[in-house]
Amino acid sequence: MGCCGCGSCGCSGGCGGGCGGGCGGGCGSCTTCRCYRVGCCSSCCPCCRGCCGGCCSTPVICCCRRTCSSCGCGCGKGCCQQKSCCQKQCCC
């Protein structure tokens, strides 16, 4: 959606619309990533899956790590966490 979830992946504009067509290159070197708006997923924020399912339908805090496991706090599988779900920023 022209929106970048991870500012250090080649998009200086961050999630404010300066990303154009997305980051493209992925987010391998990033440790944290935030989807600021609904539908703000791109290849720069591959964490928007699991209990969120595809591109985020609700604003979430994401983890960019490839492998994730349940954090054991009711979030279910995957690494997308509702803001009200866990105290931790990332569960993986």
From Swiss-Prot:
Note: Human have a similar number of genes as other primates despite the relative hairlessness of humans.
Annotated source species: Homo sapiens (Human)
Gene Ontology cellular component annotations, sorted alphabetically: intermediate filament
Protein's recorded name: Small cysteine and glycine repeat-containing protein 9
Keyword match Repeat: yes
Family: Belongs to the KRTAP type 28 family.
Coiled coil location: none
Keywords linked to the UniProt accession: Keratin, Repeat
Source taxon at top rank: Eukaryota
11 X 2 AA repeats of CG, as annotated region: 4-72
Protein task: In the hair cortex, hair keratin intermediate filaments are embedded in an interfilamentous matrix, consisting of hair keratin-associated proteins (KRTAP), which are essential for the formation of a rigid and resistant hair shaft through their extensive disulfide bond cross-linking with abundant cysteine residues of hair keratins. The matrix proteins include the high-sulfur and high-glycine-tyrosine keratins.
